[in-house]
């Protein structure tokens, strides 16, 4: 039982490390989008920042922050 719990904890920690260190570009639904940081970081906290017309959004599935593929906020 303790071994199973230990393996589960290690798996969760490694999954979080992977999500935080995910590459800057990712393909979702066949579209290439630019990720912004990852983990708890928001787009404006660090490079790469979203272009001014694209909103920073959080992925529902992975929790990673990324630039929206839809243009909005344009003046």
UniProtKB/Swiss-Prot annotation:
Expressed by the venom gland. GO terms for cellular component: extracellular region. Residues 20-31 form a propeptide. Residues 1-19 form the signal peptide. It is found in: Secreted. It comes from the Eukaryota. Its main location: secreted. No toxicity is observed upon intracranial injection into mice and intrathorax injection into crickets. This is U14-hexatoxin-Mg1a. It comes from Macrothele gigas. The lineage of its organism: Eukaryota, Metazoa, Ecdysozoa, Arthropoda, Chelicerata.
């Amino acid at each position: 039982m303790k071994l199973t719990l230990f393996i589960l904890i290690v798996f969760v920690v490694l999954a979080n490390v992977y999500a935080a260190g995910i590459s800057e570009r990712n393909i979702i639904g066949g579209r290439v989008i630019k990720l912004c940081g990852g983990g708890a970081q928001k787009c404006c906290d660090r490079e790469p920042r979203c272009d001014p017309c694209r909103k920073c959004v959080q992925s529902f599935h992975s929790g990673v922050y990324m630039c929206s593929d839809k243009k909005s906020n344009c003046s």
